[in-house]
Amino acid sequence: MLNPKVAYMVWMTCLGLTLPSQAQSNDYRPSYHFTPDQYWMNEPNGLIKIGSTWHLFFQHNPTANVWGNICWGHATSTDLMHWAHKPTAIADENGVEAFTGTAYYDPNNASGLGDSANPPYLAWFTGYTVSSQTQDQRLAFSVDNGATWTKFQGNPIISTSQEAPHDITGGLESRDPKVFFHRQSGNWIMVLAHGGQDKLSFWTSADTINWTWQSDLKSTSINGLSSDITGWEVPDMFELPVEGTEETTWVVMMTPAEGSPAGGNGVLAITGSFDGKSFTADPVDASTMWLNNGRDFDGALSWVNVPASDGRRIIAAVMNSYGSNPPTTTWKGMLSFPRTLSLKKVGTQQHFVQQPITELDTISTSLQTLENQTITPGQTLLSSIRGTALDVRVAFYPDAGSVLSLAVRKGASEQTVIKYTQSDATLSVDRTESGDTSYDPAASGVHTAKLEEDDTGLVSIRVLVDTCSVEVFGGQGEAVISDLIFPSDSSDGLALEVTGGNAVLQSVDVRSVSLE
């Protein structure tokens, strides 16, 4: 994914026009969110499980802390918690960088790049030719379970000339291939993003190498989609069960560059039907289609090849919407915490819901629990707890007109405040006093999401706190806000308060998170 804002920020850095940052003993490196070993990272690529190993590929500059020299970085894990850094998987070479794409298993060796005894794993990516700034689609393969990758000698598999009838930008805006095998039609499907045209194109192949255009999904064909949502990038597509029914539906997930609830880029998902050639979108509801109302959730993709015995659709995104501006010196960009994505009815509406994967419980320890306790205005709870890596869960019944506030990373003059305002059913994250916000005009302010009480009047909030981030999950996961924060080391306090009325705390669980 090539973002014009990123290019601008790279120039600012090259000119030495970076903003000052406060000193940090660990350079703000997260405790349990993935970061590259060093240098630049943007969105995840090619997420796939091979055997017992989860593979994370990501857009990476292995030589500098700014966007450029883009290749596929690589890390592996057996639990999605502890990551081992691996050598570059798909390198930039001969003036062609390796932009975003996806991976898939080729069990019947349709590509001919393995053999029947050892079928290959395939990775499709966008080749970005630096000299012309044009983009085409390319293929790499692995015959050693994803440890190493070889570029296909016949690249590109979709050239700019083949794209031309469907791309009015002359090869400048065709990228981020999502590829999967469509069981119903027996074909391989590729979904390409055309950011300059606000559309996706759908292609089919019998052998994963030779591709035929089939259809376009344009913004004008999606009933209810605002014309302000522009710059489509990083598509994903999959079937998702509708909880509580025997049905499944097709889902298209993508990252527009503009139009998100928090401003700028964000991730949305739409449901619809797919016949093997074209996707027909259901009418969208602007109040439920966005997967995150925070500023820092970009370029989400899902892991594939997850066994049916697991059954989860797990997604992750990059947490950074500010290019090279954040005040870190040895790294830029971090992965959101992996979360499950499901589709269910909440109240009277169908919602996408997300929850942190349960593996988080294996690396956390309870610090304090409360049950069936009423908090009143003037009280402060949890103030004895200190921590910069926490998992905080609060379930409560709010009085009419009350506002429950949870301050995290709290210090003498710093705090990030998560609030629930009962009168308008609003969940919010306030970064106004969160620490260093000078690095970007969008780094401060308040982000909000609608969160209704359940049928019994209960509100549930879960907050993942890390060195430089908060990720908030409201209700069953229908309201999510992910934001970067940059407080000082000493701002490690916690405070739970209420104003405007009481709140009955059904349960509170504060857990310390550590990979050690």
From Swiss-Prot:
GO cellular component labels: cytoplasm; extracellular region
Location within or outside the cell: Secreted
Catalytic activity annotation: Endohydrolysis of (2->1)-beta-D-fructosidic linkages in inulin
A GO term for molecular function: inulinase activity
Upregulation: Expression is induced in presence of sucrose or inulin and controlled by the catabolite repressor creA and by the inulinolytic genes regulator inuR.
GO biological process: carbohydrate metabolic process; polysaccharide catabolic process; sucrose catabolic process
Biotechnology: Plays an important role in biofuel production. Pure nonhydrolyzed inulin can be directly converted to ethanol in a simultaneous saccharification and fermentation process when combining A.niger and S.cerevisiae. Endoinulinase can digest fructooligosaccharides with high degree of polymerization (DP) values (>20) into short molecules that may be readily hydrolyzed by S.cerevisiae SUC2. Thus, introduction of an endoinulinase gene into S.cerevisiae will improve its inulin utilization and ethanol fermentation through collaboration between the heterologous endoinulinase and the invertase SUC2.
UniProt keywords, alphabetically: Carbohydrate metabolism, Glycoprotein, Glycosidase, Hydrolase, Polysaccharide degradation, Secreted, Signal
EC number(s) recorded for this UniProt protein: 3.2.1.7
Residues that bind substrate: W40, M41, N42, E43, Q59, W67, F99, T100, R175, D176, E233
Role description: Endo-inulinase involved in utilization of the plant storage polymer inulin, consisting of fructooligosaccharides with a degree of polymerization (DP) value from 2 to 60.
Family of this protein: Belongs to the glycosyl hydrolase 32 family.
Protein name, per record: Extracellular endo-inulinase inuA
Organism expressing this protein natively: Aspergillus niger (strain ATCC MYA-4892 / CBS 513.88 / FGSC A1513)
